[in-house]
Amino acid sequence: MNGMNGMNSMTPATHLLLVIATPLIGAVVAWVLGSRGLSAVRQSAAVTALITLFNAGWLVLRYLQSPEAAAGEPYAVASAPWLVGGIFDVRLSLGLDGLSIWLFGLSALLSLTAVLVSWNAIREKPVGFYVLLLLLEAAMLGVFAARDVILFYVFFEFTLVPLFFLIGIWGHEERRRAAVKFFIYTLTGSVLAFLGLLTIVLWNASHTGTVTFDIASLTAGTAAHPLPMNAEGGWLQMIVFLALFAGFAVKVPIVPFHTWLPLAHVEAPTGGSVDLAGVLLKIGIYGFLRFSMPMLPDATAAAAPWLFGLGAVGIIYGALVALVQTDLKRLIAYSSVSHMGYIVMGLFALETVAVQGANLQLINHGLSAAGLFALVGMIYERFHTRSIANLGGIATKAPWLTVFFMLFTFSSIGLPGLNGFVGEFLILAGSFQRAWTGVAPALRTPYLVMAVSAVAGVVLGAWYMLWAVERVFFGGSREPPRQAGVTHGHDAHGYSAHGHDAPAGHDGRCDLEWYEVAAVLPLAVFVLWIGLTPATFLAPPAAMLRAATRAATTAFDAQMRDLDDRAPTTPAAHVADRVVGHGHPAPRQSFTLTSKPNPDTELTLDRP
């Protein structure tokens, strides 16, 4: 109790700094303890991740109870001058708000999961592994807490370094190729994104006379002095949008910029896959919400139909490729491509309900995908294969592993009552709403086709996931072929041999160890919690989501009206004019659903 009172007396800004500093300190401690052996290193990493999670969770609770949460304002802001004087007003700033709060907490949660799933899987060079894992945690927390462009970019770039080495050193047979491909793709995109952000900074300085990297100041500045979106201005806003798109689309990844992801997932160690799927893919969507949509609304509106379509393509493409996979981990990797397509589609529907669903689905996918990747790693540790054809009957040998895998599978396919259903439902509802009443008649059919394809993706997702579950867990029991000739810590199939044979009982059971249950149980709790009380998780970001997307949504609606005004008039259109009114899209009446017991959560549905 005294400890909690002490944390409550700590200023929120100090509390935030403590959360981010803890994994950095823990990385140093793990390095120092390296001489004491594997047990000391992994225990120190687990304690560090647990302390970070506790502090992050407490900070999230403090935010939810703060007046800033209700007002949609920044919380726990810590700022220090870096370059102040003359025309420069550059301050390094950290803070949390509705856009970042859940992703911040998710980063801390999945970092503990990543440490625990690596408990017996990593035996070669454990000091370097756990140091890099903790550095990656600090970088992920920093990305979502950064309130200025410089810190955001530093943390954004720094996430690449630990993951590059985690894949390249502790990965599987093609680990080096996967690491290099991952690094080149993401580094190229992030450099272009930084050039785009720097252009925004310079544009703002040319109008205000002050060079600032503060994100809130840049958002206000671009609202007062928008970047030109016309030929006279060189289409500067669209050029900057494309530069940011290059960095964020690769990070998501949006098809066709996804080719690095399946290879990186398959070759990464389990802990790396947990962080990659659970958190790092979300940074791209966060970047769109934090920078592209509020600072470049006209370009966002112009690109929205194309990105809505790319989201639909990603849904179907990822699902179809997942259907033909024979490697369980690769199947889940392509399912991530499909699920991120839903998030992209919901975000660029520019409809309140869809955007709220997309934001919630960031958390949902982080939980379910991280859980599935963690469990696939546990399966490999026991059976030394990920081949679906060589697995079967696991339910009789590892019933708790089966229960958790089925729970995360049902979450992934959107079973009602679980978290995945809520996010997908809101995305689909908002997408159909946009397609039916929110676009010009010329675009209505393409939008409806894309929305219907998203529904087809739900069916395909259930197909490939349930197909895999049936064969791996309930098919005939098969003994996977044992491979001889392990070299350089990898077996003949290229799978890491850093793991162990899980002890089996006299009946052949090889169920989860305590640390494996501890790794996935918190994720399962949140899967159920969000599914049963979604309003609890929809309320905190609602105000910030409206603020972040308002300008882009307004610009998109204006573009739709302009497109309809320029459409050729037909006799049928004259009839429609009498019913609808002057050739414009149907006037949109709105009604609000207020979720109880959280009246702050409003889902606004429009109707003709």
Task: For each feature predicted by the language model, list its residue ranges.
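Transmembrane helix-loop-helix hairpins at membrane boundaries of multipass inner-membrane proteins
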Residues: 2-15, 29-131, 210-226, 572, ...
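Structural signature of hydrophobic alpha-helical transmembrane segments
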Residues: 11-22, 96-107, 149-162, 237-248, ...
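Alpha-helical transmembrane segments of multipass membrane proteins
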Residues: 27-32, 57, 112-116, 138-142, ...
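Alpha-helical multi-pass transmembrane bundles of energy-transducing inner-membrane proteins
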Residues: 36-38, 128-135, 139-227, 231-232, ...
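Membrane-interfacial loop-to-helix junctions in multi-pass inner-membrane proteins
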Residues: 36-52, 121-135, 150-153, 171-192, ...
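Juxtamembrane/interfacial segments at transmembrane-helix boundaries in multi-pass membrane proteins
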Residues: 64-91, 192-258, 288-306, 354, ...
